[in-house]
């Protein structure tokens, strides 16, 4: 079977392309892209007028909890959430149980993702054994099995000497070190941003300095080792300034930001104590959020990620101090970006596609996907005018801990193609995909 998308606005910054085109998919690849493509016998014709077609979206920071915490999420339910949100590829973080710190653990996730057959699962391997920050993990073995990058996400490597060692080692394999930047001796006990929120709510604060000092340290280690460095879930304006300066210097430094750090702040945490707003790193100031939006717009921050962090109801529906950090995000990321950045003219569709598809694919060392004949048909079609209200019932994820319940947003993925299979059809997940 082949698919013919008629009249889509095709946006691909790799080709300097932003035009209304027809796109024909045959088998696993794009067969033809032109102003007008005539349907062939047997083609499934999809009316894409008014919709945007982009290279498949990539989220390079998700937690699928599999293996070990399947009561929160599994590779299957996480894949369904990813497709529903418009993603063709995700990079899974290694804080599973057991920790993904060896080749067989990486291979398990890839194979399970292939069995589910919805998206490409691109596991990140741990930097250190057990993510304990003490011994180098089996980096080479994990590269051989398909690890996309390396991170001790959730903790960060506390020892500068150990971080230097892992960066020197990873630099041999054409992979990035994705750094969770947090000095735990400074952040210890913190549950909200140190400042207005901690004072107003009477809770222990988590200083921005604890993040910014480690960003600065890791940039210095990048300069020393030459290892490509990716800063995870940046949350402060000062952190963005450090990244901007590193890039100006010519260092191989990239960065990501989450929608919740772009569009929420500590001021949104009220005396209702909505634990879905408890994040790691925490929601910072409104000024930080605006600075991060500007950093996305000017390219300082390369990628939009979700840090998709599913938790069971009992882990969130409790006192703030003991509730778990994090929120789900795969199914709200695209509409949040369209609503708050594109529709407000802070970011073009070209910029959106660059941050949500092109840049993360490049950073993860994945094969480029371009909307041109001969390239793999990993594509996302979305309707930027479709309005959606976020409710618990909206989610395909096993967990419902969204920070945006009740929000009315614009822009939803309607169709997703992975290896030429239509795995999302008219906003409905298709198990195994239409071929």
Enumerate the predicted regions with their spans:
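Histidine/acidic residue-rich metal-binding segments in metalloenzymes
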Residues: 134-304
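Active-site mouth loops of central-metabolism enzymes
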Residues: 60-73, 96, 122-135, 204-208
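Histidine-rich, glycine-flanked metal-binding segment
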Residues: 1-4, 9-56
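His/Asp/Glu-enriched, well-ordered alpha-helical/loop segment
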Residues: 200-228, 294-298, 302-304, 309-384
């Amino acid at each position: 079977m082949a698919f013919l998308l008629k009249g889509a606005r095709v946006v691909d910054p790799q080709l300097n392309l932003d035009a209304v085109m027809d796109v024909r998919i045959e088998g696993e690849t794009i067969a033809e892209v032109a102003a007008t493509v005539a349907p062939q016998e047997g083609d499934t014709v999809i009316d894409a007028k008014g919709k945007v077609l982009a290279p498949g979206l990539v989220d390079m920071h998700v937690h699928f909890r599999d293996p070990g915490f399947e009561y929160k999420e599994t590779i299957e339910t996480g894949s369904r959430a990813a497709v529903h949100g418009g993603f063709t590829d995700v990079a899974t973080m290694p804080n599973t149980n057991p920790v993904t710190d060896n080749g067989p653990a990486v291979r398990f996730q890839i194979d399970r993702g292939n069995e589910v057959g919805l998206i490409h699962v691109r596991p990140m391997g741990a930097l250190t054994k057990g993510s304990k920050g003490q011994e180098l993990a089996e980096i080479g073995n994990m590269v051989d099995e398909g690890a996309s990058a390396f991170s001790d996400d959730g903790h960060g490597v506390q020892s500068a000497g150990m971080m230097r060692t892992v960066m020197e080692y990873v630099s041999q394999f054409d992979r990035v070190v994705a750094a969770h930047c947090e000095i735990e001796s400074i952040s210890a006990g913190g549950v909200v941003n140190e400042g207005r929120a901690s004072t107003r709510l009477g809770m222990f604060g988590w200083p921005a300095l604890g993040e910014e000092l480690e960003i600065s340290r890791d940039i210095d280690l990048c300069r020393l080792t030459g290892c490509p460095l990716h800063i995870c879930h940046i949350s402060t304006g000062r952190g963005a300034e450090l990244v901007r300066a590193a890039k100006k210097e010519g260092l191989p430094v990239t960065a990501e930001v989450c929608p919740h750090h772009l569009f929420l702040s500590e001021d949104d945490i009220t005396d209702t104590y909505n634990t879905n707003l408890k994040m790691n790193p925490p929601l910072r100031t409104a000024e930080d959020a605006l600075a991060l939006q500007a950093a996305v717009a000017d390219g300082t921050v390369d990628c939009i990620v979700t840090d998709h962090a599913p938790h069971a109801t009992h882990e969130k529906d409790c006192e703030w101090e003991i509730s778990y950090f994090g929120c789900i995000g795969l199914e709200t990321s695209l509409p949040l970006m369209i609503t708050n950045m594109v529709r407000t003219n802070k970011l073009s569709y070209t910029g959106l596609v660059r941050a949500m598809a092109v840049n993360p694919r490049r950073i993860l060392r994945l094969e480029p996907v371009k909307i041109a004949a001969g390239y793999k048909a990993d594509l996302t079609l979305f309707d930027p005018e479709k309005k959606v209200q976020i409710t618990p019932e909206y989610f395909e994820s096993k967990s419902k801990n969204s920070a945006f319940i009740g929000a009315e947003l614009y822009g939803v993925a309607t169709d997703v193609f992975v290896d030429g299979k239509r795995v999302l059809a008219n906003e409905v997940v298709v198990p195994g995909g239409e071929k």
